[in-house]
């Protein structure tokens, strides 16, 4: 179109020029026409070449844009895959706070503060913690072309009671978990089609706890290997594992490196869980318990758990609830921390009951009750007996989107007859704790929404007889005796 316009303009100019006297005056019309035509053809050639170069440049520009669009799409796809299936994850838990008693000194606290705490009897944790504790979980997941995946996990943890900012000399920083697992393996079929294989040092995936008491119902952990999610029937999955734990040396007998091994089958059928464990610790029977003449430790044991995990609050309200009963014999009589107690006797027996849950009572009120109880005998010394029961209730009143008032009440009864084990005395009595904690949150949408920032006041009291259980526990120490104790403080707690 541009070239046509140029030709028309040139013809007009030529027509006007040929009618002028100057044109007529000069001779050789034909020669002049030939010269003019040559110049026109040359101009057309230059215009055609210029247009071709412009078209080529436009084509290259279009190709460059298309290449850029494709490259951007591919880059976004790779970035999405990297952030997902090939992603790196960071998860954690932490709590930290200040606990001050009514005299202005550092307060005494902790879920295992009572004499029953020496055998696992926890009490409510709200307004009762004086430590800084953190867990950092680093995970890397890879997904392959055939759909199989691999995951690596590292967990670091540390806990201190000092309020100082530099705590290296008091630190207990350690590696609590380091393991790898693989799943969705292409060559696996039948019951193992969706199985997950693992090996390393870890907490068992199916452990569960009562958060309000900071107490696991069952805690299986150590170093070993296993397989999860073997499909034995339509609604029946089973886990199989072997864990090892180190009992250390028995210097009196010259034995070293005594280890406990835990062989586990953990079954899930619908909402039901049935766990069976066998324990063995070769040569552990040469261990003689302090204060128990002739009380040789066990070298084997058994443990079982039956639990129901409900997706409602005991069938009467939305929420959740769990109930579990546990039994253990010999090395299995440590019902919570499987394989963690090397001093249990061959005849040790223990039974534990756990019932807990959480629900909304009304649009602005939430409640979380819990019951935990245990009885054991012939535990460390022939004829000893330990009985305790804890009732705990946490209540939350939502004031606004960011503020709630939290209340917690704990009552624990204990009857302990240690028969002189570690110099401990027989005692019985009860313990009571009441806590009021105004709490600030980014969103007050549930009990388990974190982080929480709390200020609190806690009152505790207990039977005076409990002051005499042991010389090295909290109760009975200076400024911490029966008759009522106040603690005040501030705390943060978070997980993600």
Residue ranges and their predicted role:
Residues 103-126, 164-179, 187-293, 473-478:
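Surface-exposed coil loops of outer-membrane beta-barrel proteins
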Residues 8-18:
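Hydrophobic helical h-region of N-terminal Sec-dependent signal peptides
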Residues 1-9:
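Bacterial N-terminal signal peptides that target proteins for export
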């Amino acid at each position: 179109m541009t070239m046509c316009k140029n030709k028309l303009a040139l013809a007009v100019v030529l027509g006007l020029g040929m009618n002028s006297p100057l044109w007529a005056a000069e001779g050789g019309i034909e020669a002049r026409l030939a010269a003019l035509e040559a110049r026109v053809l040359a101009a057309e050639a230059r215009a055609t070449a210029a247009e071709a170069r412009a078209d080529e440049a436009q084509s290259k520009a279009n190709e460059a844009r298309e290449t850029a669009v494709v490259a951007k799409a591919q880059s976004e796809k790779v970035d999405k895959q990297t952030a997902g299936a090939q992603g790196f994850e960071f998860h954690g838990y932490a709590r930290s706070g200040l606990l001050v008693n009514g005299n202005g000194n550092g307060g005494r606290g902790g879920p295992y503060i009572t004499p029953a705490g020496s055998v696992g009897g926890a009490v409510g944790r709200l307004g009762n913690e004086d430590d800084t504790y953190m867990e950092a979980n680093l995970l890397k997941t890879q997904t392959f072309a055939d759909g199989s995946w691999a995951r690596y996990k590292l967990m670091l943890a540390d806990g201190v009671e000092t309020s100082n900012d530099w705590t290296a000399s008091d630190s207990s920083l350690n590696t609590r978990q380091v393991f790898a697992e693989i799943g969705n393996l292409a060559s696996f079929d039948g019951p193992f089609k969706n199985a997950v294989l693992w090996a390393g040092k870890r907490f068992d995936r199916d452990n569960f706890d009562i958060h309000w008491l900071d107490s696991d119902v069952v805690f299986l952990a150590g170093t070993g290997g296993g397989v999860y999610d073997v499909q034995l029937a339509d609604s029946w999955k089973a886990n199989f594992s072997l864990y090892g734990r180190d009992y250390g040396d028995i210097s009196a007998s010259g034995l070293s490196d005594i280890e406990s091994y835990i062989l586990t089958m953990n079954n899930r059928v619908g909402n039901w869980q049935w766990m069976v464990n066998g324990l063995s610790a070769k040569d552990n029977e040469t261990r003689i318990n302090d204060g128990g003449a002739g009380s040789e430790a066990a070298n084997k044991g058994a443990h079982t758990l039956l639990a129901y995990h409900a997706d409602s609050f005991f069938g009467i309200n939305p929420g959740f609830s769990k109930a579990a009963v546990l039994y253990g014999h010999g090395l299995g009589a440590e019902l919570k921390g499987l394989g963690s107690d090397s001093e249990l006797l061959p005849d040790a027996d223990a039974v534990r009951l756990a019932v807990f849950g959480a629900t909304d009572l009304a649009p602005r009120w939430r409640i979380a009750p819990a019951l935990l109880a245990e009885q054991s005998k012939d535990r460390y010394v022939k004829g000893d007996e330990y009985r305790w029961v804890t009732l705990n209730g946490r209540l939350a009143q939502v004031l606004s989107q960011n503020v709630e008032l939290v209340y917690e009440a704990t009552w624990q009864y204990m009857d302990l007859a240690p028969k002189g084990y570690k110099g401990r005395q027989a005692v019985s009595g009860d313990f009571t704790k009441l806590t009021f904690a105004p709490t600030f949150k980014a969103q007050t949408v549930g009990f388990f929404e974190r982080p929480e920032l709390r200020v609190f006041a806690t009152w505790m009291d207990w039977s005076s007889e409990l002051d005499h259980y042991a010389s090295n526990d909290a109760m009975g120490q200076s400024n911490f005796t029966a008759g009522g104790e106040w603690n005040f403080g501030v705390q943060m707690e978070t997980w993600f």
